Amino acid sequence: MHGASKTYLAVCFAIFISACGGGTAAPMQPPPANFDLQAGMAKMVANGLSSNVALSGTVTVNGVSTAFTGSGTFTRPPAISATFNGTAALSQTTTVAGSVTAAGQTKSYSTSVTDYYASSDGAFLGEVSASEYDVAQAPILFPTTVVGGSSGTLGTLSRYTDSTMSVSLGTAQLSYVVMIPVDPGSSMGIAVTTKIYDTQNTLLETDVTNYTMTSSNVISLSGASAQNQSGTLTVTAD
């Protein structure tokens, strides 16, 4: 859920390196709607999420920044029972597959990351990719009441090379921002940001995943972005 965009970015890099005011009183507005973000995330874990996506960005190869574009699919099936860090959990794997084109060359790709949630309350426990094993320092729950303009820190992941947790890679800090709806009662935009740091607390990468959530706590993907010293990536849901 939280680190998928960093995985997309790494894969793209690997592919190409290897190849107003008024004078009258305003009408009274209804109070802002309250949304249950934790319930929305729990529904997403239970029901899954999928979308066609467009890809764009830049990748630096041999000191030269090259633009790329592409398209693919984002799939996140319903979670299944699993074990994570010695405890019962739910696992949900996000996969992005498709093709990207840069400098006249088109390459196919497929990459995935698996997120883990507590079976009891749906708290986020951590995630695993091909090169990392990340564990929440404390189980992460999203707020149960948010309104447009809400924001806050969610928690911190400890990053390791593998499940032995013997080699530290640093930390990842998670936060969220809720966008103010254009119209009262309309769906609300949610941005979940992951800032990735090395063991010296140097910022390596910033990833943002954007969701839309209805008043019924149904979440859909809007897009995602990632940025590090090697380039940028923007993912836009069709």
Language model feature labels by segment:
Residues 30-69, 74, 237:
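N-terminal segment immediately downstream of the Sec signal-peptide cleavage site
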Residues 46-54, 85-96, 150-155, 184-192, ...:
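Short, hydrophobic/aromatic-rich segments at coil-to-beta transitions
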Residues 59-118:
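N-terminal mature ectodomain segment of secretory-pathway/periplasmic proteins
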Residues 222-238:
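Short, low-complexity, Pro/Ser/Thr/Gly-rich segments in the mature regions of secreted, periplasmic
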Residues 92-162:
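Predominantly extracellular/secreted and cell-surface proteins with exposed
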Residues 2, 9-39:
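Bacterial Sec-dependent N-terminal signal peptides
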Residues 105-126, 181, 203-222:
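A short, surface-exposed beta-strand/turn
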Residues 130-202:
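Short helix-loop boundary/capping segments
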